Amino acid sequence: MNPVPPNPTTNAPAPGGATHPTPAGSGSPAAASPTFSPLYQQIKALITQSLQSGEWKPGELIPSEVELAGRFKVSQGTVRKAIDELAAENLVMRRQGKGTFVSTHHEARAHFRFLRLVPDEGVAHYPESKFIDVKRVRAPADVARLLDLKSGDAVIFIKRVQSFDAVPTIIEELWLPGLIFKGLTAERLVEYKGPMYGLFETEFGTRMIRASEQIRAVCADAGAAGLLGVAAGTPLLGAERVSFTYGDKPVELRRGLYLTAQHHYQNELN
């Protein structure tokens, strides 16, 4: 049994809502044969489209499995499998006895999903931020490439120092596409008390879905040493992260330097 919206002769919609029809008139057997995706993957793509379009806002309850099964004319088991995958990807959250909700960066557990630096002792908590610089600039070539922009396009540049218990620990430089984050100012960043990704989600309609990160050992130069209150040459952890929203669209480049004297980088792999 197929759901009504997808066309069975095309690929299922990608998470960003794109479809990829099989090219017509191709002479190769591979191109001439239609490509099918499992039914639950088609349903997953359709639900993701609704999330991306804002039909269900972050933090809102989505329709029940029974309601979604009726909407897409598929079995409840097919819907459940689709939602299981969405939950595994942190796009939705199941709450026992309450239903399934759209994930939000305002959830307490989401605060540490993208912050992997945790204390060697004690309970992990969110750092305090001091903004060093916030300005609108032209994207350098390397930044433009990583954000899928043109060199010279407008970006928002943010530099901040984050401290745990008044100890400077993280230096971050961020680049955000200027069109998406138009209106983001230093004043707004300072007055906003929640996680930065929560601000992006609420005021700019941009939710971080996943990130790709590169990590290497570096030494503090004079500038970093001064901001962190350590000697030049102190070992630091350097990380470059590109974060993506729906449709695998890059919307943030973040370069960080981490002092690990009292913290360590922790990740869970599954």
Regions found by a protein language model. Name each.
Residues N2-G25, T104-N270:
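All-alpha effector-binding/dimerization core of bacterial HTH-type transcriptional repressors
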Residues E55-W56, E89-G97, S103-T104:
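Beta-hairpin "wing" of winged helix-turn-helix
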Residues M1-V74:
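Extreme N-terminal segment that seeds HTH/winged-HTH DNA-binding domains in transcriptional regulators
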Residues T78:
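Residues in the helix-turn-helix
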Residues Q52, S75, R95-G97, E203, ...:
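Short glycine/serine/threonine-biased micro-segments
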Residues I83:
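DNA major-groove recognition helix of helix-turn-helix
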